[in-house]
Amino acid sequence: NEMRLPAFVGRLNHKFANGSMLSGRSFVAEKKTSQDEEWAWGVGIGGKYQLTPKTFLKADYNHIKGDGRFLMWTNSSYVIDDQKHIQSNEFDSISTGITHQFNTQFRSTLGYGYMKAKDNNAFARINKDNTAQNKELWQGWINGMYNPYKPITLGMEYVYGERETFDGRTGTDNRINMMASYDF
């Protein structure tokens, strides 16, 4: 890895009077090795719709080529082929969820996320037997977040998901997460 330039990121937000929001995002990033270089890029659009003062829907769509560091659920950004050339991962992802603030201390989110990698390119062919790289992946989750007092947040989340690798192997993710955070 011989990258010297940072990622160039652009974002445009539009907020509505009722608390809803639309967002457009893009980035370009250098990918460079001693033998090859390429530009990674991505575009995304998302929104938040305020259903009630305490409930909102959120959705995002992204298309990325060559860099997955800005999103969860992604594969490696690229792989190096036999000729030492960069072969980029390319994928689409969506996520959606609904969040409700029950009172000043407790909120909950029900969400869903999906990622589908392009499976007819060199990245997929090279990673055909790699069990760490996903052709498709989805997850659903429900959580509860409790703020006993500011700045402490305690949370619990149930996650279920399924994945498929480029060679057709499948797996499941079925877990409970617990967290505690302190906002400085």
Spell out what each predicted region is:
Residues M3-L5, R11-N134, W138:
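Detector for outer-membrane/organellar transmembrane beta-barrel domains
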Residues G10-R11, N143:
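Short, surface-exposed beta-strand/loop micro-motifs that present aromatic residues
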Residues A29-K32, Y158-E164:
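A short, acidic, flexible beta-alpha connecting loop/helix-capping segment that sits on the rim
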Residues S108-G111, N143-V159:
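Conserved active-site loop/cleft motifs that coordinate metal ions or position small ligands
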Residues Q139-I142, M178:
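A generic structural signal for well-ordered alpha-helical surface patches
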Residues Y146-P148, I152, G171-F184:
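Outer-membrane beta-barrel "beta-signal"
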Residues T165-R169:
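Short proline/glycine-enriched turn/loop segments at secondary-structure junctions
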